[in-house]
């Protein structure tokens, strides 16, 4: 996970840096600036959840994404079986698809990395989103899952914020105290500071998030998933021999997009017959675990 440069290119820079920097390298940390990530795909789907689910099903978006990403079907199969083995009661309105979306994101590095890159560079405009953003299904269900988990937690515990930690190795962040930033991606952050420690130089974020949701019931780790649209104020920044320490405090939210898939389809999509286009959706609602396992593997 990483922050973005203007234009959404920081993800690629960081990936190249990690791939090209050997373990134990003494090279100077990569220095990057942060901003509000204006080009990141940040849809909150406010007021259109039911319509989004209908469009995703009718448009066979899951199948389209499976066809685009060669590892995708196997990642979802594995995540589905993982969820079946640990399935717990879900909050109101949350479905097994929401749960498996969290599992596939938190457990599969290829999925989370490619989603981050797509959010940065494949949705800079409505037209680009429509043609080039091939994570419409996953993006919606991750966003919706965070919102539903927060709603459930708020109902039980009132307004809920989390103090979490996220570390980035060999990266020096240029962020001024008092400035407002956002990550522009789904960021997994740990509730345990010790889990973020790595060898070498590291930028450690201490994040006070009020829009993130605890996903430890799904990922089996004490972590919180922060949505791409949450804003943060840089409260403090200090240096140490092991790297920078940056404290962030939630400062609301900001989105450029809302219900973008529906807007795109209202312009060019012909009405489709009501069918369950996503075979994955069929399998996850089967109550029998053994039957679900047989049916999950069959379509792929």
UniProtKB/Swiss-Prot annotation:
Pfam families: ART (PF01129)
UniProt keyword annotations, A-Z: Blood group antigen, Cell membrane, Disulfide bond, Glycoprotein, Glycosyltransferase, GPI-anchor, Lipoprotein, Membrane, NAD, NADP, Nucleotidyltransferase, Signal, Transferase, Transmembrane, Transmembrane helix
Lipidation (GPI-anchor amidated alanine): 264
Entry EC number(s): 2.4.2.31
Main localization, broad class: membrane
Top-level EC class as recorded in UniProt: transferase
Residue positions assigned to the propeptide: 265-300
UniProt catalytic activity: L-arginyl-[protein] + NAD(+) = N(omega)-(ADP-D-ribosyl)-L-arginyl-[protein] + nicotinamide + H(+)
Transmembrane segment boundaries: 270-286
Domain of life: Eukaryota
GO MF annotations, alphabetized: NAD+-protein-arginine ADP-ribosyltransferase activity; nucleotidyltransferase activity
Signal peptide residues on this chain, from the entry's feature table: 1-23
Sequence ranges on the Extracellular membrane side: 24-269
Name recorded for this polypeptide: Ecto-ADP-ribosyltransferase 4
Record organism: Mus musculus (Mouse)
């Amino acid at each position: 996970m990483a922050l973005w440069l203007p234009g959404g290119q920081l993800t690629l820079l960081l990936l190249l840096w990690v791939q090209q920097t050997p373990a134990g390298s003494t090279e100077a940390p990569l220095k990057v600036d942060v901003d509000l990530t204006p080009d990141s795909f940040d849809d909150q789907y406010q007021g259109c959840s039911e319509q989004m689910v209908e469009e995703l099903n009718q448009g066979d978006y899951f199948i389209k994404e499976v066809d685009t990403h060669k590892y995708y079907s196997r990642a979802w199969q594995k995540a589905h079986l993982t969820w079946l083995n640990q399935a717990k009661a879900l909050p109101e309105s949350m479905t097994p698809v929401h749960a498996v979306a969290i599992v596939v994101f938190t457990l599969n590095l290829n999925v989370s990395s490619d989603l981050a890159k797509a959010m940065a560079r494949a949705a800079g405009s409505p037209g680009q989103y429509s043609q080039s953003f091939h994570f419409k299904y996953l993006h919606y269900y991750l966003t919706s899952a965070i919102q539903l988990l927060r709603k459930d937690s708020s109902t039980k515990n009132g307004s809920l914020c989390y103090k979490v930690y996220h570390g980035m190795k060999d990266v020096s962040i240029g962020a001024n105290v008092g400035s407002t930033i956002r990550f522009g991606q789904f960021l997994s952050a740990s509730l345990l500071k010790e889990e973020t420690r790595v060898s070498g130089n590291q930028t450690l974020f201490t994040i006070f998030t009020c829009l993130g949701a605890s996903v430890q019931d799904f990922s089996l780790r004490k972590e919180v998933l922060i949505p791409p649209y949450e804003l943060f104020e840089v409260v403090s920044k200090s240096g140490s021999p092991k790297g920078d320490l940056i404290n962030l405090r939630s400062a609301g939210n900001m989105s450029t997009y809302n219900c973008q898939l529906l807007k795109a389809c209202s312009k060019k999509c012909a009405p489709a017959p009501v069918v369950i286009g996503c075979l994955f959706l069929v399998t996850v609602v089967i109550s029998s675990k053994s039957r679900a396992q047989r049916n999950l593997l069959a379509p792929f």
